[in-house]
Amino acid sequence: PYTFRNPLYHWTHLELKTAFGIDKILNPHTAREIYDECNEKLKQPEYSARGMMRRYHVEVVCTTDDPIDSLEYHIKTRESGFEIKMLPTWRPDKAMAVEVPADFRAYVEKLAEVSDVAISCFDDMVAALRKRHDFFAEQGCKLSDHGIEEFYAEDYTEVEVKAIFNKVYGGTGLTKEEILKFKSAMLVVFGEMDWEKGWTQQFHYGAIRNNNSKMFKLLGPDTGFDSIGE
């Protein structure tokens, strides 16, 4: 009941009805019964991931993937001969997340390792991202998806953006203006990459993340406690 007026309330009951044939309202009194019923059905072959996709006549599945993801399961699925296409979607949000310098540096270091590109400046990071962008294209990617709180369109110069990268990569916090400039620059960079390959660019706009402070401390970020920003 605490999800009422949140899309999760409708989505949850829609899935229970259409996928599992369950009409009950999910609440503390029915949770165990529904949980057990769903798990019993999930043991059946027709309720496996592939079974469900076949049941709903799915032709293509597009996942959401970070630039540093290996896409190994996309490759394995394709090589297995599975008749439904599984394609990656480029979701580079963490490359724009400069609010916490330590987290940003850790991400850039992972990007450098995965791309095999030494990163010490802004241009290096863009080169590494472009290499991963090429890899995603090789695996059939045709879409990008960007989770943003607003459409960033702050004026900036290349000199400013390079200095901002050096500052945050060096561990110094940024001002609000610097954050907006950096995010604006990255949206342009990603837009150019997508345009060059003819990809469709999508914006997951206005979602408020990590609303539940208790669960954020327990589980970490992006674990399902989002809502629509209004």
Regions found by a protein language model. Name each.
Residues 1-197:
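Metal-cofactor-binding active-site regions of metalloenzymes
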Residues 173-230:
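Long, well-ordered mid-to-C-terminal structural blocks that present hydrophobic/aromatic surfaces
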